[in-house]
Swiss-Prot record:
This is Replication restart protein PriA. GO terms for biological process: DNA recombination; DNA replication; DNA replication initiation; DNA replication, synthesis of primer; double-strand break repair. Belongs to the helicase family. PriA subfamily. It catalyses: Couples ATP hydrolysis with the unwinding of duplex DNA by translocating in the 3'-5' direction; ATP + H2O = ADP + phosphate + H(+). Zn(2+) 1 binds at C452, C455, C492, C495.
Amino acid sequence: MYYKVAVSGSGKVLNVFSSEELLIGERVWLNWRNGKVKGYVLERSLSHENEATPSERDGKSFLSEGHVEIAKWVSERFFSPLGMVFDLFFPQGIDDYKEEVVVSESPFLDFDRMTLRDFLENFGEKALKEMVKKGLVRVEKNFYVKEPRPRVKKRLFLKKRISEIIREHLTVKQRMVVEYLQFNDGVPLEELLEDLEVSKSVIETLQRKNIVEIVSGDVFPKKRRILRGDFKGNISKENLFFGPTGSGKTEALFELIDVYSRKGTVLFLVPEVSVLTHTLSRLKGAFPDLKIGIYHSYLSRARKNLEWYKAASGKIDVLLGTRSAVFVPVKNLSLLIVDEEHDESFYQHTRPSYDAIVVARKISEVFDVPIILSSATPDLWTYREAKEGRIRTFNFTRRFGSLSVEVVDMRNEEKIGSFAKKTLDRIEETLEEGKRVLIYVRRKGFWGRVQCEVCGYVLKCENCDVSLVYHSDTHSLKCHQCGREYGLVESCPRCGGRLVGRTAGTERVERELKRYFPTRRIARVDREVVDNIMELESYIDKLIRGEIDILVGTRLITKSLSVPEIGLVCIMDVDSLIFNPDYSSSLRTFQLVVQALGRASRGDQGKAIIQTYNPEDTIIRKALEEDVNGFYAEELERRKALGYPPYRHLIQVAVKSKNPEVGKNSLTSLKEFLKGEEVLGPVEHWVFKLRGFYRHHLIVKTEDLERVLPKLEKALRILGIDAIVRVDPPTLEVSD
């Protein structure tokens, strides 16, 4: 029998002959070109050409024909190599957790299955080959997981009230345990250690502090939490949960999980690990009896494979994960949920590129399961389809808290450093009320750029066409694209004029605040001080516990941060977001401002302040009014007139080269090949030089991807151009 097999890590498809019947979606290892490659069985082939020979196979497939259909579709829709797309369905290292078994296919054999090792010891390799050839046995891989043996469970409980624990001096990991137990008091000890990836020594220390206690056995019956039952809607195939922060969207999602987890496995996608950690705690608190798996990039290889296997084998009720979890072949899928579906993190820019939202909707279609997209500021594609009735909309309104927003016109205000005096007054008032303050700054570093005040020259990285950022703690200039650091220079290298800092970054804002409020506890969160999600969680924990009064940060701090103690949110330098040279900058700014303001609406009387030199800008005005519908109507009208998504698709084709003329000429040739299509460019990318390479790109606008993408693929192949292709990226400014 002949089969078409997609080669792992590439776009190559081989025609393969196998004496054994192969399963659709099964992994096979092929002898090809003097080596061995992994492949995925696509379908039976009518061609009798034999390009490679199978040497090994799984013997079973975790992927159904539906998954194969999805892989083909994703490859075509996002111009991603088919073999690379198939690789996304499996975690790295999955083959470290397998054993080969021989399975009987004949009633006359005296065994049902035995390990390959035992079979070879008893019968030998020659017998195995003969029996496989005759169809008497088959060899398959049994993927195993090392799960603990059943035993009496030890459960962990808090012994002290939270008000008492707050006064204790705890490490970051100890605080993580306490916060987890706030939602999940009485959780099995092994489950907590697995979820938080902490050692038993952390628990032992908390025991010595008399904060927790361990009790053996099931000391209370497990049960589902009785939910409010406020959500009465009957969902359709595709649904949008649309409403501001605090409107009850999450509670409604939990009620649906309560229903659909009884029917199968719920796949719950979130944009970031920080959001996942908080959602996991809430889920376990609401459903202590549910088996909840997690899947994200910070898991150890062993843990990730374990979680994947459980989901693929139908051993969990809910799989909670970030972008990559959309490809886990969940067995008996009953419901798809995408929270914060507007977030750009759902798009993978590196090859193979894809949009997890679009993939999730395709999964919903292929496997005929409902999907919920939830957001206060939906993606424009989603919003347009909802308005046109193709997606059912459930509107939610805020049930608690109110928000007072003040716009500070920086043209007319008295300024003290990076702040208006009015802003500093509001910060002081908030602190006097015992509330916390959150300050959003777009850039990290001390100064966003260093510029000559005489000729205007901006210091840039030699490898990248990017302005250097001054960091006061190291007294150095740093490129935040390639990471190269430079020593300080005293004068302008062009004219000898005086160099000055422009556009305050997080370091500068933090230092100013420490000068204005010397007795207050002020911290900074950006990628320079936070390396992983656990560190970010520790800052949030300190904010909740009152160990931080003012938290300064970049976009990190706007990601679903739920802290009722926040009394004021300040947004600095909003203008730099609005005037970013990207077709999506207005929408991205609006979404960020609304999401940031949502952090202040968790409390009883939240306040926010926005510093701007353009107070009449539509984006700011609509965001203040939380007029999502009004802003989206205007944005849709603008994009329709300009031919941008969601009315037309955008295909970005980018190249990089050591010689700038080479890249530009290659894209010029490509444009000629695409004659008849609407093509913008080629032009220099606004980050023209990056890591020593010069970058050019062009944009293709089309309403018909199925027609244009094959044409583009043919052109790139004939011209021999190695390009990065992104279909409908949320932004065009991402570096390669």
